[in-house]
Regions:
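Bacterial Sec-dependent N-terminal signal peptides
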Residues: 1-24
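Ser/Thr-rich, low-complexity intrinsically disordered terminal regions
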Residues: 21-189
Length: 189
């Protein structure tokens, strides 16, 4: 019984910690760009009350480093000012053509900028879009139009799974990094 109570307490505590982090939610537009769902801006600002920009930078650098297998290959930084993430998500979404699933991946750039008490996450930029069995597809916005992923500027309900895969890949990554920065128990392993 004590173990069950302890387990429930720890689960509740982890949800509380995650709840402290702001939910990051970028959505895909018909132009092939991502924007903040709340206000259609191309960035999200996360507040860190009472923290200096140097402290926030260090926390972000640790969180980003933990999120990748080989961080030195994808992270560029301007000390205490900016972190640039140049990554790849293979098979991030599936598109069905004549019932045949085609898996797509993407290369992307995400920039994090810092001020005292704040971190700005610029909307991810898709720098390369590719099928696992085909060469690069450019421009990404042209592919979205050609495949009717959007109709009249609105998501095509029949292709929503493609949009969800792209948005989910970025939002899950960024929310994981953000939650890691807010997690105060990471040192007690």
């Amino acid at each position: 019984m004590r173990k069950a109570k302890l387990l429930l307490f720890l689960i509740g505590l982890s949800f509380y910690q995650i709840g402290l982090a702001q939910n990051i939610n970028f959505i895909l537009t018909s132009a092939g760009t991502l924007v903040n769902k709340e206000d259609s801006s191309d960035f999200v600002v996360i507040n860190f009350e009472g923290k200096s920009k140097d402290e926030i930078f260090e926390e972000a650098l640790k969180a980003v480093t933990m999120a990748y297998n080989s961080p030195k290959d994808i992270i560029s930084k301007v000390e205490n000012e900016m972190i640039s993430i140049n990554g790849t998500i293979p098979s991030c979404t599936v598109y069905r053509s004549l019932g045949i699933p085609i898996y797509f991946g993407m290369d992307y750039v995400i920039k994090l900028q810092f001020k005292d008490g704040k971190m700005r996450i610029n909307a991810p930029y898709i720098s390369r879009w590719f099928a696992d069995n085909a060469p690069n597809i450019t421009p990404f916005s042209g592919w979205l139009k050609a495949q009717s992923v959007f109709k009249n500027g609105k998501p095509n309900p029949k292709k929503q799974y493609t949009i969800d895969g792209i948005e989910g890949s970025f939002n899950n990554l960024l929310n994981s990094i953000s939650a890691s920065m807010f997690n105060k128990n990471k040192e007690s392993w």
